[in-house]
């Protein structure tokens, strides 16, 4: 079985980070933490509200602080927000403190998975959601690739299968 090294999931919104992360933590008997949920709990407000009040910069500063703190824990599976990798400091913390898995997805699949989700501040009130997703991918995908130890496409398999596959990859990665 994989040793209890931290596992950090990165990737765009709608890639399945939270869903796969929960399954993975269960398989490995590790604690699962979703950084977005942690931010909301500590702020006592949802992310959309934080974006409205503090702007994206304010949110990113909160996110950077909280991820810095969370990545210092031991034996966790951490699902990060899609934009967490925009911070060089966050990328450095992720790389230094665990195995980083980039959950890759296509813009088409993202569009399909996020179109009914009202909790995506970067997609609120947007005319052309697909264009926003494409623009985000252009900026962020190279950063996900830069920080990743392992890259996995998530479009075709269930979260349970993905989690099992990650366990195998981590065993190989650790040996």
Swiss-Prot record:
Cofactor stoichiometry and binding remark: Binds 1 Mg(2+) ion per subunit.
Similarity annotation: Belongs to the shikimate kinase family.
Broad class of where this protein is predominantly found: cytoplasm
Record: residues binding Mg(2+): 18
Name of the protein this chain belongs to: Shikimate kinase
UniProt xrefs under InterPro entries: P-loop_NTPase, Shikimate/glucono_kinase, Shikimate_kinase/TSH1, Shikimate_kinase_CS
Gene Ontology CC: one annotated term: cytosol
Organism annotation: Mannheimia succiniciproducens (strain KCTC 0769BP / MBEL55E)
EC code: 2.7.1.71
Quaternary structure and partners: Monomer.
Record keywords: Amino-acid biosynthesis, Aromatic amino acid biosynthesis, ATP-binding, Cytoplasm, Kinase, Magnesium, Metal-binding, Nucleotide-binding, Transferase
Binding site for ATP: 14-19, 120, 157
Enzyme category, top tier: transferase
Catalytic activity: shikimate + ATP = 3-phosphoshikimate + ADP + H(+)
Keyword flag Protein biosynthesis: no
Cofactor(s) listed: Mg(2+)
Record function comment: Catalyzes the specific phosphorylation of the 3-hydroxyl group of shikimic acid using ATP as a cosubstrate.
Protein's pathway: Metabolic intermediate biosynthesis; chorismate biosynthesis; chorismate from D-erythrose 4-phosphate and phosphoenolpyruvate: step 5/7
A GO biological process held by the record: chorismate biosynthetic process
